[in-house]
Amino acid sequence: MHNFALKGDWLVKDLNNNKNWLFELDHQDKDEIIEATKHSISSRKKLYDITKSYFPLNNLISKINMIQKQLDSGFGFVLLRNLPIEQFNDEEVKYMLWGIGQYLGYPEIQDKAGSLLHVVTDTGSSVNKTDNIRGFQTNEELQFHTDGADVFALLCLRNAKNGGLSKLVSSVAVFNEIEKTRPDLSEILQEDFYFDSRAQNPNDDKFQKVPIFVK
């Protein structure tokens, strides 16, 4: 068994020494995003029907390409600052996030309702009450996990009154540490485990059988 030799293997000290994961939008970038967002809204297309052609970007493409490279072969995540969300209401900001996302990948259905974008908000429920409730609909702390898509994005509309912090960890670094200290467990973690599917697809089994780590 060998360690995963990937650039996604990082510790906090690596992030402090190398800020390639941090991207700041300047005034020109923001103006271009504002105009693209207005253009997509004025098209009167439904959110899921918005493609690159309805969200035109030009000067920002080079920065988006750098973001894509960082996601694919860098640390595996980025922080994008200064999105001009104050120019729009919450529904309009969805067009901004969706439009930028069109330049980074293809949307993937996230649940049985066919949702491609979720609003993270507390509905007063709990994941322990019903299979139909997922973590982003509660105020409960979510444990470290990975989602099914290759890339996902979180956009902060406003600071939470309490909590709302996001934490990241390198799954590659976690595996390599287990491989170094407990190689017997690294073998087991590459075997199948049962996970609650949270009723995301009516045609799926209630539980999914997948390994925790996959090469």
Language-model regions, residue ranges each:
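Active-site environment of non-heme Fe oxygenases that use a 2-His-1-carboxylate facial triad
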Residues: 1-66, 73, 78, 85-87, ...
